[in-house]
C-alpha cells in the first residue's frame, strides 16, 4: 500500500541531522544508519549511507534514481545460496 500524499515521506529525525552534518563538513565518510524504513530524499544525493541489514552495514551510494525509495530496498537481508541441483545429472 502506498503512503498518503498528504502525510509526506517518512524520514527518521536523526538521519536528517546526520546528513546535514555530513554536508556541512564536506567529508565523504559512510553515515551508519539503522532506519531501513526511511525514504531517500533529494538532499541525500551524493552521500554514502551504511544501511544495517541485521549483520553489517551495507554501503549505499545515493544517486538521483534512488530518490523516493526506501533505504531498506538497497540492503538485502537474506542471502540466496541456490536451489539444489538434479541428483541424476550429478551421478552420470
From Swiss-Prot:
Task: State the Gene Ontology BP annotations.
Answer: ribosomal small subunit assembly; translation
Extract the SUPFAM superfamilies matched here. Ribosomal protein S19
Q: Would the keyword Glycoprotein be found if you checked this record's keyword annotation? A: no
Tell me one Pfam family matched here. Answer: Ribosomal_S19
Q: Which UniProt keywords apply?
A: Ribonucleoprotein, Ribosomal protein, RNA-binding, rRNA-binding
An example molecular function term from Gene Ontology annotations: rRNA binding
Described by its record, this protein's role is as follows: Protein S19 forms a complex with S13 that binds strongly to the 16S ribosomal RNA.
Q: Which NCBIfam families match?
A: rpsS_bact
Protein's name in the database = Small ribosomal subunit protein uS19
Q: Which organism is it from?
A: Rhodopseudomonas palustris (strain BisB5)
Gene symbol here is rpsS
Amino acid at each position: 500500500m502506498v503512503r498518503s500524499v498528504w502525510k509526506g515521506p517518512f524520514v527518521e529525525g536523526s538521519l536528517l541531522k546526520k546528513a546535514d552534518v555530513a554536508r556541512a563538513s564536506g567529508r565523504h565518510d559512510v553515515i551508519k544508519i539503522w532506519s531501513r524504513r526511511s525514504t531517500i530524499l533529494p538532499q541525500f544525493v551524493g552521500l554514502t549511507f551504511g544501511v544495517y541489514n541485521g549483520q553489517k552495514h551495507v554501503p549505499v551510494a545515493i544517486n538521483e534514481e534512488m530518490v523516493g525509495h526506501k533505504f531498506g530496498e538497497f540492503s538485502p537481508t537474506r542471502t540466496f545460496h541456490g536451489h539444489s541441483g538434479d541428483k541424476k545429472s550429478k551421478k552420470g
